[in-house]
A protein has these predicted regions:
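Active-site activation/catalytic loop segments of kinase-like enzymes and analogous catalytic loops
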Residues: 230-252
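Short secondary-structure junctions
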Residues: 10-17, 69-73, 187
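Active-site acidic catalytic loop and adjacent metal/ATP-binding pocket
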Residues: 26-36, 42, 77, 181-232
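ATP-binding pocket architecture of kinase catalytic cores
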Residues: 36-139
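ATP-binding glycine-rich phosphate-binding loop
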Residues: 15-31
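A cross-family kinase active-site recognition segment
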Residues: 112-168, 190
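An alpha-helical support segment within catalytic cores of ATP-dependent transferases
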Residues: 2-12, 136-140, 155-197, 207-214
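Structured catalytic core of nucleotide-sugar glycosyltransferases
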Residues: 75-79, 84-100, 154-161, 194-197, ...
Length: 254
């Protein structure tokens, strides 16, 4: 990656002089930006075929949450010098890209945090409830797209079940699919709204030193937002929070 090129882009559009390093990203490029005045940001360089509505949905959702002043730890959108929240730009190879910049939140990923406790789980539950309350009034056309990670559409996995070579694992998945089909009609009857849709252990940040009470310092990645039964947001988060716990069901009942 040509960091010098992206440094020039940040200087041109955001007026930020910086040092850059690459962060993790599934489809898009995420660059950690350390400015010369000791501020930290994340430059999000979207995949070449990224739809503008995809970025707009995320930005509008974050702005919506911020406008309600819940004091929840979501990143601030950093506007360009000209007041834009995202820009179209060619990369160093001449490919069209969508770019946007957010303020970096403190903390480390929940999956990497060693001092997990019940207070963190309770705090996360309260935070999800507040987030869901706020997103109940959020609307965007892109929320209604077809999305594999929308739990209402989860039946798509059935046609791929023969890819599972381990017979015992295949039976587990088959049983889950059967149970899913049984509850799907009732799930469709639940209240629908905009949800985050991907509050997993890589999208939750935790901060706090050895002597401090750890706390949820950030929720990231609004890219899997969708219009879905509200309860699905809590179910998704619970599925990840219980990982590596000896008594997972007792944990989500607190």
């Amino acid at each position: 990656m040509n960091f010098v090129f992206w440094q020039s882009i940040l200087e041109k559009y955001w007026g930020i002089s910086s040092k850059l390093s690459l962060l993790d990203g599934e489809f898009d490029l995420n660059i950690l930006v350390r400015s010369t005045d000791d501020e930290q940001y994340v430059l999000k360089i979207m995949r070449e075929d990224c739809l503008q509505d995809f970025v707009d949905m995320q930005i509008q959702a974050i702005n919506h949450l911020k406008s309600i002043e819940l004091k929840l730890p979501f990143p601030n959108i950093i506007q360009t010098i000209s007041g834009k929240e995202f820009i179209h730009c060619k990369d160093e190879f001449g490919n069209n890209r969508l770019l946007w910049l957010i303020k970096k939140l403190p903390g480390q990923k929940y999956v990497e945090f060693k001092r997990k406790n019940l207070n963190l789980v309770k705090e996360l539950g309260r935070m999800i409830a507040k987030c869901d309350d706020a997103l109940e009034s959020f609307e965007h056309d892109f929320l209604n797209r077809s999305l594999k990670w929308n739990l209402i559409e989860a039946y798509w996995v059935e046609k791929h079940i023969d890819l599972i070579e381990d017979p015992s694992r295949k039976v587990i998945v088959q049983n889950i699919i059967k149970e899913y089909k049984n509850i799907l009609p009732k799930l469709r009857e639940q209240p629908f709204q905009a949800i985050h849709g991907d509050i997993n252990d890589h999208n939750i940040l935790v901060a706090g030193g050895l002597k401090d009470q750890p706390y949820i310092s950030g929720i990231l990645d609004f890219g899997d937002m969708c219009h879905c039964p509200r309860v699905c947001n809590l179910a998704i988060a619970a599925a990840y929070v219980v990982l590596d716990h000896d008594q997972p069901l007792s944990l989500i009942h607190i």
